[in-house]
Every structure is written in C-alpha cells, then in structure tokens.
Amino acid sequence: MNGTEGPNFYVPFSNATGVVRSPFEYPQYYLAEPWQFSMLAAYMFLLIVLGFPINFLTLYVTVQHKKLRTPLNYILLNLAVADLFMVFGGFTTTLYTSLHGYFVFGPTGCNLEGFFATLGGEIALWSLVVLAIERYVVICKPMSNFRFGENHAIMGVVFTWIMALACAAPPLVGWSRYIPEGMQCSCGVDYYTLKPEVNNESFVIYMFVVHFTIPLIVIFFCYGQLVFTVKEAAAQQQESATTQKAEKEVTRMVILMVVFFLICWFPYAGVAFYIFTHQGSNFGPIFMTLPAFFAKSSSIYNPVIYIMMNKQFRNCMLTTLCCGKNILGDDEASATASKTETSQVAPA
C-alpha cells in the first residue's frame, strides 16, 4: 500500500519512514509545502468572497421583488441555498484548517464538514436535474397542456433535499464514512479504502450510479431534446427572427450548462473513481485536491449561469443595488420577455 490508513483517516503517503501523523492532530507539511496550504486557504477565501455575496444577493433580491417569486425561481433559489451550504459548511472550514495545515476540528468536525459540503453539492446537482426536466416538459411538451406551477416547484425542491440527504446522511450512520482527503484539510466520502466494516464499497458504487451517472444522463437527455425541439421550431418558422434568436439563446444556455457541469464535477468524480478502482495505487495529495477546486467553484458558476443571465432578475438586482434605479435603463417590457415561468421556446 502506498498510503497510510488509520482508524478514521487515510493519508496518501507511505509511513515507511515513520513521518505520517494523524491529520486530526498534526500539521501535514510532509504532504505539501506550507505555501501550498496557504494557496489553498487563499483559494477558499476567494470562493467565500465571491460565492457568499452573489448567492445571498439572489435570495435577497427575490424577497424584495414579488414578481420574481415564480414557480421556476423556487428551484433557482434552491440552488442559491445549496451554494450557501457549501460556502458556510465547507469553504469556511477548509479556509481555517488550511491555515493550520491539518484538520483541527477532529473526527466529529470532519463528519459535519463532509456532511454539509456533500449536502450542498447534491442539492445543487439535483436542482439542475429538476431544472432540466422542467425545461424539457415545458419546451418539448411531451405532455400537452402542462404548466409548471407552484406545487410542481415545491415538489421539485423537496425531491432535491430527499435525494441530497440520501447521499449525505448514510456516512453518518455507518454506511461508509467521511475522512480527510487530498491535503487533509477538508473531508469527503472515503474513496480510498474498501473498509468492509462500514460497507464502503457498496456505498461508493451506489453514490456513483445514483448520484452522479443517473443525473448526468437525465441532464444530457433533457437538454439534447430541448435543442432538437428548438431547431425544429426554427426550421418551420425560418422567417421568424424571434424564434431564431430563441434558438441561439437556448443553445448557448445549454452549452454553458453542460460545459460548466462537466468542468465542476467530472474531474472530481473521475479522480475519485480512479482512486476507488485502483486501491493502493501511488498518488499524491494534490491529485485529489486540484479536481476538488473545480467542484467547489460551482458555487460561483451556478448563480451566474442560471440566474444572472435572466434579464428580469438582472434588472431587479440592479434596481435593488442602485436604490430603486436601473442604471442600464432596460424597460419592463424587455425584462418581462425573459421571465423564467414562460412556457414558450425561450431560455430560463
């Protein structure tokens, strides 16, 4: 084995020389240089500085403007809540522990940090699935005369929390476990060991299939059908500039959604899957730490892609920030055209 396993940790460093120490008790500067831990802390600080204001502003602006409280925006707000979970439950902890060079909060703190970070990430992921299904049902119309209403939105939000808890809670009750990962300053699901005492192998397989592969398939299917439907509508109404514009906007949104989803989550999932399927292989702490950067950065991409590109929300945000004045001067008509509750071929 090229790593060192303890009762509640796995350090990706051989203890042949006797230098490995518990990541809950001692600085891990034998894994990486102190300046690298400082860089990790600086990155976490950047995510907090950017992630908290934009997600908090999303919630605040929606509360201030009644016209934003549409059914679909419930899901978008759920994304903001999920991102705030990641900011407060994960980023702040990692910032503090990185400054000390090890996970100073002990196994209990590791469980809490791992739970909240996983919960926030999974709420965001399943919110994207609900958004994809909503766009598919509204635009592609597999069910005629369907209108996405408040009850559907509430059910969608509840569904995201149920699925997120189904992923984040089991390690707290004996199915798998949370341990420090990468540079040992943040915690996540144990991909490093089989750990039969907690049936770790079955949980990791369950997590990859149910909480990554299936959501990815659903998202690709829904947006693939959406693009096809928009192209077909444009082909039948080639003289319609509005339809052609809608096609371009929806296509751009779809490309951004898929690309940033993959950027945020695929590297982390791919590395975790490699580590799990190559037990005992030689890899360094940076190997797992770098992909996690992309996953954590989703707290910034989500509000930018799913909310900031909406004209109505952007106008309301500017009005709130500028004390009732819209400095861009966009009129209400243009804002209304981009309402997320629309049932015609238009981007969310």
From Swiss-Prot:
TM ranges: 37-61, 74-96, 111-133, 153-173, 203-224, 253-274, 287-308
Pfam families per the UniProt record, alphabetical: 7tm_1, Rhodopsin_N
Short motif 'Ionic lock' involved in activated form stabilization, span: 134-136
Residues with N-acetylmethionine modification: M1
Gene Ontology molecular function: any one: G protein-coupled photoreceptor activity
Residues with a covalently attached lipid (S-palmitoyl cysteine): C322, C323
Family (UniProt): Belongs to the G-protein coupled receptor 1 family. Opsin subfamily.
Keywords annotated in UniProt: Acetylation, Cell projection, Chromophore, Disulfide bond, G-protein coupled receptor, Glycoprotein, Lipoprotein, Membrane, Metal-binding, Palmitate, Phosphoprotein, Photoreceptor protein, Receptor, Retinal protein, Sensory transduction, Transducer, Transmembrane, Transmembrane helix, Vision, Zinc
SUPFAM superfamilies, A to Z: Family A G protein-coupled receptor-like
GO cellular component: membrane; photoreceptor disc membrane; photoreceptor inner segment membrane; photoreceptor outer segment membrane; plasma membrane
Keyword Zinc set for record: yes
Sites of N6-(retinylidene)lysine modification: K296
Annotated region (Interaction with SAG), positions in chain: 330-348
Positions glycosylated per UniProt: N2, N15
Residue intervals on the Cytoplasmic side: 62-73, 134-152, 225-252, 309-348
Name of the featured protein: Rhodopsin
Subunit structure: Homodimer. May form a complex composed of RHO, GRK1 and RCVRN in a Ca(2+)-dependent manner; RCVRN prevents the interaction between GRK1 and RHO. Interacts with GRK1. Interacts (phosphorylated form) with SAG. Interacts with GNAT1. Interacts with GNAT3. SAG and G-proteins compete for a common binding site. Interacts with PRCD; the interaction promotes PRCD stability. Forms a complex with ASAP1 and ARF4. Forms a complex with ASAP1, RAB11A, Rabin8/RAB3IP, ARF4 and RAB11FIP3; the complex regulates Golgi-to-cilia rhodopsin/RHO transport in photoreceptors.
GO BP annotation list: absorption of visible light; G protein-coupled opsin signaling pathway; visual perception
UniProt membrane topology term: Multi-pass membrane protein
Extracellular side: 1-36, 97-110, 174-202, 275-286
Sections of the chain in a coiled coil: none
Binding residues for Zn(2+): E201, Q279
Subcellular compartments: Membrane; Cell projection, Cilium, Photoreceptor outer segment
